[in-house]
Amino acid sequence: MSATKLTRREQRAQAQHFIDTLEGSAFPNSKRIYITGTQPGVRVPMREIQLSPTLIGGSKEQPQYEENEAIPVYDTSGPYGDPQIAINVQQGLAKLRQPWIDARGDTEELTVRSSDYTKARLADDGLDELRFSGVLTPKRAKAGRRVTQLHYARKGIITPEMEFIAIRENMGRERIRSEVLRHQHPGMSFGARLPENITAEFVRDEVAAGRAIIPANINHPESEPMIIGRNFLVKVNANIGNSAVTSSIEEEVEKLVWSTRWGADTVMDLSTGRYIHETREWILRNSPVPIGTVPIYQALEKVNGIAEDLTWEAFRDTLLEQAEQGVDYFTIHAGVLLRYVPMTAKRLTGIVSRGGSIMAKWCLSHHQENFLYQHFREICEICAAYDVSLSLGDGLRPGSIQDANDEAQFAELHTLGELTKIAWEYDVQVMIEGPGHVPMQMIRRNMTEELEHCHEAPFYTLGPLTTDIAPGYDHFTSGIGAAMIGWFGCAMLCYVTPKEHLGLPNKEDVKQGLITYKIAAHAADLAKGHPGAQIRDNAMSKARFEFRWEDQFNLALDPFTARAYHDETLPQESGKVAHFCSMCGPKFCSMKISQEVRDYAAAQTIEVGMADMSENFRARGGEIYLRKEEA
């Protein structure tokens, strides 16, 4: 039976209550730890899962235990994961990166906003109740300067952001001593470079080569540095955003916090409804992770939703507006060229990308080349002044497996490769967006084409969905493809929720999508052989074999669901120490039987060993002390 559907008023009230009562909190039996770096202010948060000891012998009255090491894990929740930090959504998060940005001395505060739209919004008194109170004074690069992480990397500069990332990517695995936990199967990396220890210099080198990006707008100092690249942990993006028919500012902030709690490495705000500007300000000021947008959505709202009325001037104003708010990466559909649009005519599902369809309609109605392509160098100049990364959109991605890997898809991909080189001329960081709907046997070609034609820039894919028959379960159909393409080298996976193709996701849908994609990303890290990726799996397996139920729950990606499923049939506290679960019961538990076999074998080994020693003793004549030459 599904839960009672809340009214719009109830949904908003629930979200407001969530925000008003929000506190920093850790997962069960976890604690927040920080690992410090060598540069000022580099203090990297991680979550450490505390484990119970293993019973190794003794008696019922005097049992003997062996301690189990705590397991450090990557944590995207920012201050929301630290019970010691007071959270106030009205004030926003602390500006972690502000001292680093200021110390570089290459930015200046703006006395006047560059965007006419922003000026108009700020002058509108009617928006005061909606507006975030502590609006940041935006910065931009000083004249003649570039402030991107790519620029610094190419200059040989290791920024605090790079050191922060190096520590974060190592996940504290140097703290683990147990050989059982450190054991790892060799991976198949398909050419990825996966060093045993990630250093700040390695991070710098990968960024300088364009193989990785650090989305870090100078106007989003609240964000904790992270990296997207195939030689690092596979990342996951969550999409949130209102629409013309549903959701509010409160609900979107709630979804942001919820997303970071469940492992979103970045969040895209895809709002298309009212108060886009104000919603985004609330999100940015409260986000510990990079925020991406699709600027064409808001530009379209500014021309009343009429694609033909879009202009470069309106789009440019939108870029400036969002860059000065702090958006970390823009999805730009600059590869949808006029000559590619006819290639989609024979497709089963045509053009399914919103941004792609908007630009295709504009091109056809004006019979002109895509203005994003025509003005791409100007786009790069704007991005270089704020360190906004470019996510080059796949506007011609396939919307069904029948259309996978067709002429239009790869023609656009090749153009994205050309645009990548242009962006790099301006020291602008770039990643490439990918499909979509692709059956399993056709997935790897997407990765090889991208690496070859886009010069190893990071790949960022939506799934891909491997079958089209499962509306309501597309987090599964796409999670399969996501795990595969992540293994092949995809750097970031855009989650798909159960509501894909059906409606706007709610809070629970966001969680389901993220858990599915964290599984896919982790499976890809294991398959690639990412150093340390197997530690948590080994800890879980050890806890499972030793019937440490609480540790099993706490090591899970979703401890609450794991515990709830167990407690449906064994709710008593005794069930948390039982050497069986309800699947097999006490007599047929394979792990319990395995333990008994192991104990029996160990006892037999001791008994046989003692018999051998006894026989040897008798053969030597039964003397307690042997002559020196006989010893």
From Swiss-Prot:
Cofactor(s) this protein requires: [4Fe-4S] cluster
Residues holding substrate: N239, M268, Y297, H333, S353, R354, G355, D394, G395, L396, R397, E433, Y460
EC class: lyase
Keywords: 4Fe-4S, Iron, Iron-sulfur, Lyase, Metal-binding, S-adenosyl-L-methionine, Thiamine biosynthesis, Zinc
Glycoprotein found in the keyword field: no
InterPro entries: ThiC, ThiC-associated_dom, ThiC/Bza_core_dom, ThiC/BzaA/B
EC number: 4.1.99.17
Residues the entry annotates as binding [4Fe-4S] cluster: C581, C584, C589
Superkingdom, natural source: Bacteria
Catalytic activity, reaction form: 5-amino-1-(5-phospho-beta-D-ribosyl)imidazole + S-adenosyl-L-methionine = 4-amino-2-methyl-5-(phosphooxymethyl)pyrimidine + CO + 5'-deoxyadenosine + formate + L-methionine + 3 H(+)
Pathway listed: Cofactor biosynthesis; thiamine diphosphate biosynthesis
Cofactor binding note from Swiss-Prot or TrEMBL: Binds 1 [4Fe-4S] cluster per subunit. The cluster is coordinated with 3 cysteines and an exchangeable S-adenosyl-L-methionine.
GO biological process: thiamine biosynthetic process; thiamine diphosphate biosynthetic process
GO cellular component: cytosol
Membrane-spanning intervals of the chain: none
Pfam (any one): ThiC-associated
Binding-site list for Zn(2+): H437, H501
Family: Belongs to the ThiC family.
Quaternary structure, from the entry: Homodimer.
Protein name in UniProt: Phosphomethylpyrimidine synthase
UniProt source species: Escherichia coli O127:H6 (strain E2348/69 / EPEC)
Gene: thiC
